[in-house]
């Protein structure tokens, strides 16, 4: 001991006084390296337990990836473009460039998985960096050289808090700056961002989950071959590929080609499901340079209607990887569907004398491009699965919908004109004459012509309005009950006849029936509106596009929304129509007032026979009666308080429903404190699968929506006093913002506490009792339950929820 003291003194400046000496000794000793400074990069204790046989990817690894990783790395907005939904996504790796960049002046090169590159080497040429070991292969190197492993280990070294909110150094905002370290950059990243391990800003993996992933990575991340079509699907694929490429035998080559092109441009993002196959077995329709019977070689174009530059074969290939809710849109193919297509497209009498070009002004305008196909056939095809096509612009590859969704209300109802109704906008002659007026900015692709575009397309819309006015100016009004015959009734059995759309800030969802209280607005959609929405925001929308492309799409969507809402207004008395229209928006529609033809259209009397002073409510009720069961069951929780609306269910379910009825009374200023979409698990006291789920949806009211660039609180001139709540007994939406968990015997107290919220402090106290924060030790257990519950509710339509928007509350 003396020797060590004297040695220390010799190395330090000697000062008088025993206390000072001790202080100096302490200071000197602190200069020694930390015992953990040079610890091993890998966890050797886990390597000692490495099994000889390969870890099963599908049986052991994939479930962990789906439940803990894909929940944030599943869509285009996955951090660092690291999509963990498939083997190809894992091998592709990460990229520092953001897909969503609303301010870029030039379009980015697309990086769509399974489309824009097919091999790992091709992705490296597109500047994607590996997250797995691609060097010397052994179990140690497989971990040392794996960014994925290093991220997992970083979380184990620096676990997050297990109570309360996350600290401010966790940035969970969508537009946060992303750091995407390569292997060479990882040590610096770990030093600067010690809490940046994975899962980021979420609870740690369990020891078992972590060990399984580490063992798999140490083994070299073995992944099985891609799934192949099942025997049941193989036969149907041959039949469908024959139909699409060869027709029925009685159709001309031109007719076959035009119909196949039309179907592809509408189904290119569908998850196809074949009759008789497993509920979770899906396929994709692609354009290939190879004929049926040969391996598919996808023709990659930026948009589905771009020139393929080579002979096209329409092929069906197995969907690979995990199914995420945000991009999961199912389209059923069956013998019955094939008969329907033959009836609408192949057996219908019409001639195709020539095929439309792939030039943008033609290809982006389906009214012109497919004029040879009868409007009735096209419209009935869209109506058969109207929800699917509406979903196209609020789901699909556009994982963030600021562009399209910032111009729609938070809750509204949608119905459609009957395809057999004798109205001008559904007639072939009228649409063919006005087709040039129905061009959209999709034809501009990525050309930046913002102001010129607005003026140009406004002029076209004016001409279209004037054409409609001229066509109906001599028509007299019809009784409101007779006017119902203009509305599509879905043949009395198709649930697509009535839809409800919910907007959740920059995402949305659509469901069958009239859901929620009577909405502020509604749409009536005709063929051209539905078709133009698809070509503007699905077929023609490019998430890699530039500022001009995104702004032009938003501006034109204003016109389409207005057209659908104005059709609804035409079913109201003219004397009330303009007043109602003005109340809907004080700002968003000011620019519409000077569109030539709108005022005249608004003043024309189309209906008569209203009996109350609230014609809008009366119209909603007329639609409910007319559509019957297709409009829904009256919505016992949100709208109908009569016992006749009460669903058949157990006493405890009815008890929960009645309690949730009171939660729908939450309205006004306090709603802004609440999450956009909150999932509620009501524990029924038995098995987990017997618990029930609710979704609490905040419906925000707006004076106007003015910009697509800034956060809502900065740019939306909100009408907070008219905010409302909708509650449904199922899981609605793809991006839950928060989870609540409550016992059935506490359900009344839950709602009482919810309704008592008046400020942020009240809400935090409510969350402390019922909420599942990002720090909760039970967070993953409940997140798993909600995904499992969704699968129970919708065995075929469900997908993995995305937790990118989960709040830190």
Regions found by a protein language model. Name each.
Residues 28-809:
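Aromatic- and Gly/Pro-enriched helix-to-coil junctions and flexible linker segments
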Residues 13-26:
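Bacterial N-terminal signal peptides
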Residues 1-10:
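N-terminal secretory signal peptides that target proteins for export/translocation
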